[in-house]
């Protein structure tokens, strides 16, 4: 029996993508796979319906769990609050409970210096990341309070260390960290713990970049002290499973770097 059997986990940005070796090629899908192996029922949201459908098919067939998929695109033109409320309504109708919320979705324009950033580029990062986290957090709270659940949010070394060309992305991710610490403080009394992960994972985007531009990849992508870039399921998803488990309920409001030693900081 898996440790999350009978429980429900919501993961944003969890469409299916795989690497050339068949391993999970996106962080969200790696997390979904890790929880499916523990018997959790899953709610997966994202913009790309075909990737969500592919994830549902794969996870249900392999792990005998129930997967609810919902298209949700948080941007500066949609009624975002209504979209998130719809997600919560569907969770209540389908599963009747929510035990873990994982805000993973994020879009951004990378490599643009601050002086050249546009309002549109800033909005892309803020709405898909910070605003999405705010709305999901706000409307998941009643369900999480009932189960004394867990929240895991994703930030980045780009925000911690001010990476060049990551103005909008870093702003969104540091906003998410601040929002998460406030939630950890306010919701501790309800038995809800909230933590933040800063990951470094080998994704299908990185693999394609390496294949198409090997010289640029070598110059710009640095291997951490551990000697490899993290595995989305084994080294990111499995940590999410642990952080969301009862054994880690006392840990809240913390930023956890999963960067193989690259994110060393005081």
Language model segments and positions:
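Canonical Rossmann dinucleotide-binding motif of NAD(H)/NADP(H)-dependent dehydrogenases/reductases
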Residues: 2-42
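Short C-terminal tail/terminal secondary-structure segment
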Residues: 20, 111, 161, 222-223, ...
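Catalytic Tyr-x(3-8)-Lys segment
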Residues: 74, 214-234
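Substrate-binding pocket helix/loop in short-chain dehydrogenase/reductase
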Residues: 87, 112-114, 118-123, 217-220
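Active-site helix of classical SDR
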Residues: 137, 172, 180
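Short, small/polar-rich loop/turn modules that mediate ligand/substrate recognition or access, typified
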Residues: 188, 193, 251-253
């Amino acid at each position: 029996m898996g440790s999350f059997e009978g429980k429900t986990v919501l993961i944003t940005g969890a469409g299916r993508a795989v690497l050339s070796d068949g391993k999970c090629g996106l962080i969200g899908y790696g997390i979904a796979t890790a929880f499916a192996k523990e018997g959790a029922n899953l709610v997966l949201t994202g913009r790309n319906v075909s990737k969500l459908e592919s994830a549902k098919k794969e996870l249900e067939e392999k792990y005998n769990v129930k997967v609810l998929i919902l298209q949700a695109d948080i941007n500066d033109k949609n009624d975002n609050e209504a979209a998130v409320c719809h997600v919560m309504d569907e969770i209540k109708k389908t599963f009747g409970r929510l035990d873990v919320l994982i805000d993973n979705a994020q879009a951004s324009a990378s490599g643009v210096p601050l002086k050249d950033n546009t309002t549109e580029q800033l909005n892309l990062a803020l709405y898909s990341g910070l605003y999405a986290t705010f709305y999901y957090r706000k409307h998941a709270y009643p369900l999480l309070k009932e189960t004394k659940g867990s929240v895991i949010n994703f930030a980045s070394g780009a925000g911690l260390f001010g990476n060049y060309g990551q103005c909008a992305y870093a702003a969104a991710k540091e906003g998410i960290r601040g929002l998460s610490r406030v939630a950890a403080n306010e919701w501790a009394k309800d038995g809800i713990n909230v933590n933040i992960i800063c990951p470094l994972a080998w994704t299908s985007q990185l693999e394609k970049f390496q294949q198409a531009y090997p010289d640029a990849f070598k110059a710009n992508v640095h291997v951490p002290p551990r000697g490899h870039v993290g595995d989305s399921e084994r080294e990111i998803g499995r940590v999410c499973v642990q952080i969301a488990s009862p054994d880690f309920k006392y840990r809240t409001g913390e930023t956890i770097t999963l960067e193989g030693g690259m994110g060393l900081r005081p």
